[in-house]
Amino acid sequence: MSTRNPAQSHWGVPKGQRTELYVYNTLTHSKVPFVSNGSNLTWYCCGPTVYDASHMGHARNYVTTDILRRILQSYFGYNITFVQNVTDIDDKIILRARQQYLFEEYKKQQGTNKSHSEAREKVTEAWFAYAKKNLPEPPSSMSEWPQWLASHDIPTLAINNPKLPMHVDALKSALDALQVSEASEIISLDGFWPKVQDVLVPLLDAELGSTVTDPAIFRKLAAYWEDDFNKDMANLNVLPPTAVTRVSEYVPEIVDFVQRIIDRGYAYPVTDGSVYFDTEAFEKGGHFYAKLEPWNKGNRELIAEGEGSLAALTGKKRPGDFALWKASKPGEPSWDSPWSKGRPGWHIECSVMASALLGSNIDIHSGGIDLAFPHHDNELAQSEAYFDCPQWVNYFFHAGHLHIEGQKMSKSLKNFITIKEILKKFTPRQLRLAFLLQQWNTQLDFKETLLAYVLNIEQALENFFRTVRALMNETEGVSANGGHVPEKFDKLEIELLEKFQQTQQNTHLALCDSFNTPLVMQHIDNLVTQANIYIREVGQQPCSRLLGQIASWITSMLQIFGLDENGHPNAVGWSSSKGSSSENTDAMPYIRAVSSFRDRVRELCIAKASSQEILKACDIFRDYDMAALGVSFNDRPQGSALVKLVDAEELIAAREQKLEEERAKQAKKAQAKAEQEKKQVERVMKGKTSPSEMFKMFKEYLSFDEAGLPTKMRGEDGSEIDVPKSRKKKLQKEYAQQEKLHKEYLSYIESNKS
């Protein structure tokens, strides 16, 4: 395994004026002073390889790059020429386009075969070929599949073979489709083909891939996913590039670029018509290879991955050499060149396109950290060989990896979340906030605790903006009506002003420290907390002028970070996540609501209604009419209510929640009352029998006095005897208790007659 022992190359500080800004530069793996030649910057960003949907890893990379670009442009004031490429010639695109085409053609062909026996045979053949290629000790028959699964610990094997679970799932899916189709003797197009696609397309490609010759097949796939990528970036509020370079439009320039490297002695053609970069000759010529990650210089796995899955690799002088031009085989798109009909290597594409627009020295080059070696290291080598210069790029910005709940994302493992999927759960602003809260060049773990923190910060900022807007509107109303608005800064105002000034200074220092946005957001959060404390402590008339300046500055910083695509200068707060402001400027709905309220109050007064009825009408106006318009009235202990403009759906949801809580409270109260009444009835019914009759139902008593108390009873021998004194005393006590209960019973009956 590679280590980081090899020393990195010397990095030269660019010529120009030093500033306060220090940036993390992957060329040194440290923070270095940012030096530019004037106010103009050139920036090349590695764009997408367009063969599939963009995922969260892309979001982290491109939104993070966008944040850095916005800071340099809008905070530090640089004019940036931002060039981003589209890789539309690549082995992944060739394979995906070819396999999709062959799969669709095969489905059409089989659509005329009613028995589909040929399709089952082909999928069965593909199943065994796929298992043989991708499984350790594959089963020799499909009947052995359950035994194979039981005897192999997939999670443990996946530690050294991460793609194994994906292959197992593909085989499971295809086998299930085969078994279902055999049982029913028919093939359901919806159920069969999607399940067998992953195992079938490699076999179709191996047998028929060389027959695919139409260039439009490859371009169609790339064009579709390029458009899809652009839509995702627009949805994420990523600024468009100054220029987009598409590889297919720069092939002649690439051929010329490769020829010049050959002429300088840093590349060599081989017998199959491919051209390779000579890393040994490059270093002997006084250059340094693998500036970014020298410890990976001999990492054959990364080198092979960078060459692509269709690379022939014949005729290379040494393993570390890489392709500048690939001779195309049948079934691969090709262009003319002095060496062969072929296509560009992956790494040369970016070198040529960046140099074509930005020249022999570029201020900033950016991309994901996974591209550092070999892609970016090879870019540097090619360009420095072409220009024979020591430093083609001054600063390399690499966005850190993205993990999901601690797990690495990978397209090949099919465990990635697409941008469209994540935007169904979170807004673009919330995603950007999540990226802002993590230092741009470090690993980000996208997990529930981070998202909960993001939602809390977003809500805290929104509540602060609403309160400040409400206080500013209130002050404007007082002034408009000729009222007095105090402007004096007392102790609390001075303390808040000092906190504001310190936050501005701390924010500047944090941004100068390699764009430390997590620290900036912490400073902003602390300032909001301090401002809220001030509002509570100062009482009825907080200084809306100072609060407005604080809120406006915070808003401007959030706009710089790209958190408000519809923001405008001097705004207080961001627009809603749906793209429209919650402060509706159309006055008619409000006028109509006030007019209707006036009519109701007028009718109540004419009818000489009670004050309670009028207050009820006021509550309806507040909780229903105005809530539907996004207006909140917050009653205060003294004076007028504080008026806020809030999203109507939020107010309605809060009202319904409050009503639901009240209904639950009343239901609980009613249940308690019913239980109490039940107990009362049970007690009352015990007194239904008159005390004068209560003992006459017992046969042991033979005679009674006028009140109904027993005087005679049967003795043990059956003879008549006087009631003993001890018994008489007990009976008198029971009589008194029943007399009390009977009175309660009679009273209850009387009271419930109505």
UniProtKB/Swiss-Prot annotation:
Q: Which Gene3D superfamilies match?
A: HUPs (3.40.50.620)
Any one GO biological process: cysteinyl-tRNA aminoacylation
Motif 'KMSKS' region per UniProt: ranges:
408-412
Stretches with biased composition (Basic and acidic residues):
672-685, 713-725
Q: Which reaction does it catalyse?
A: tRNA(Cys) + L-cysteine + ATP = L-cysteinyl-tRNA(Cys) + AMP + diphosphate
Co-factor(s): Zn(2+)
Which InterPro entries does the annotation name?
Cys-tRNA-ligase (IPR015803), Cys-tRNA/MSH_ligase (IPR024909), Rossmann-like_a/b/a_fold (IPR014729), tRNA-synt_1_cat_dom (IPR032678), tRNAsynth_Ia_anticodon-bd (IPR009080)
Q: Does the keyword Ligase apply?
A: yes
- Locate the region Disordered: 664-686, 709-736
- Coiled-coil region(s) at which residues? none
EC category name: ligase
Chain sites annotated for binding ATP: K411
Give the matching CDD domains.
Answer: CysRS_core (cd00672)
**Note on how the cofactor is bound:** Binds 1 zinc ion per subunit.
Q: Which GO terms describe its cellular component?
A: cytoplasm; cytosol
Please indicate the residue ranges that the annotation assigns to the motif 'HIGH' region: 48-58
Note the Pfam families from the entry.
Answer: tRNA-synt_1e
Q: Which family does it belong to?
A: Belongs to the class-I aminoacyl-tRNA synthetase family.
Report the PANTHER family cross-referenced here: CYSTEINE--TRNA LIGASE, CYTOPLASMIC (PTHR10890:SF3), CYSTEINYL-TRNA SYNTHETASE (PTHR10890)
Question: How is this protein named in the record?
Answer: Probable cysteine--tRNA ligase
- Where does this protein come from, organism-wise? Schizosaccharomyces pombe (strain 972 / ATCC 24843) (Fission yeast)
